[in-house]
Amino acid sequence: MSNNPRSIIAIVPAAGIGSRMGADKPKQYLMLGQQSILGHTLDTLLAHPDIEQVIVALHPQDNYFNQLPQSQHPKLTQVVGGGERADSVLAALDYAHNYNPGAWALVHDAARPCVTHQDITQLIKSVAIHPQGAILAAPVCDTMKRSDASGLIVHTVDRSLLWHALTPQFFPVSILRTHLSAALAAQVPITDEASAMEWAGVMPGLVNGRMDNIKVTHPDDLQLAALFMSQQ
């Protein structure tokens, strides 16, 4: 693995309840074909040759995870997550730091089952040009509008430098842990790992990822994810 970190630990925050899906269980456990969304996500991460370990942060009352076949995989570790995504990531980073403080964290959304090995490998290799860390992202293609508080268009936003932030996001375990912990202590709104790094003054790299790496958020996304996976 030339120019790549020696130890890569994937982190999957999976403690959320996914209320926008309106389902009877957390969205990561909804079926996508023959197995759950989370099952597909974990299969991809566990099978990647550069990933040494996968840490899944779970809700303390999770009654579903141990029913997944992936829960018994020797590369997989469970930790108790927190109330927000960032809290779950930090809990996993604490474990990863104790395991190997020199490792790199590959943080990936549980509800992005369409991520490919090609994109993961491309992100890992980007360390050669982005030693501070990087994220998968996709350029904004739609026309972007800024509104006022009443919902009226104020102006059209220049999209030439706008990107959709995707996952995985890839940073050194110890550095991300330090910055994420400090940002949460300062009550900074953290929506992804890159935002914690940005708050600390780090400028993460952007790695162009596939547009089919969608996050399953609404019911219609399940059919779209199934279509994308059938074409990969």
Swiss-Prot record:
Function: Catalyzes the formation of 4-diphosphocytidyl-2-C-methyl-D-erythritol from CTP and 2-C-methyl-D-erythritol 4-phosphate (MEP).
Classification lineage: Bacteria, Pseudomonadati, Pseudomonadota, Gammaproteobacteria, Alteromonadales
Protein name (database record): 2-C-methyl-D-erythritol 4-phosphate cytidylyltransferase
Keywords: Isoprene biosynthesis, Nucleotidyltransferase, Transferase
Molecular function, one GO term: 2-C-methyl-D-erythritol 4-phosphate cytidylyltransferase activity
Stored InterPro entries: IspD, IspD/TarI, IspD/TarI_cytidylyltransf_bact, Nucleotide-diphossugar_trans
Family: Belongs to the IspD/TarI cytidylyltransferase family. IspD subfamily.
Catalytic activity: 2-C-methyl-D-erythritol 4-phosphate + CTP + H(+) = 4-CDP-2-C-methyl-D-erythritol + diphosphate
PANTHER family in the record: 2-C-METHYL-D-ERYTHRITOL 4-PHOSPHATE CYTIDYLYLTRANSFERASE, CHLOROPLASTIC
Record pathway: Isoprenoid biosynthesis; isopentenyl diphosphate biosynthesis via DXP pathway; isopentenyl diphosphate from 1-deoxy-D-xylulose 5-phosphate: step 2/6
SUPFAM superfamilies per UniProt: Nucleotide-diphospho-sugar transferases (SSF53448)
EC number: 2.7.7.60
Nucleotidyltransferase found in the keyword field: yes
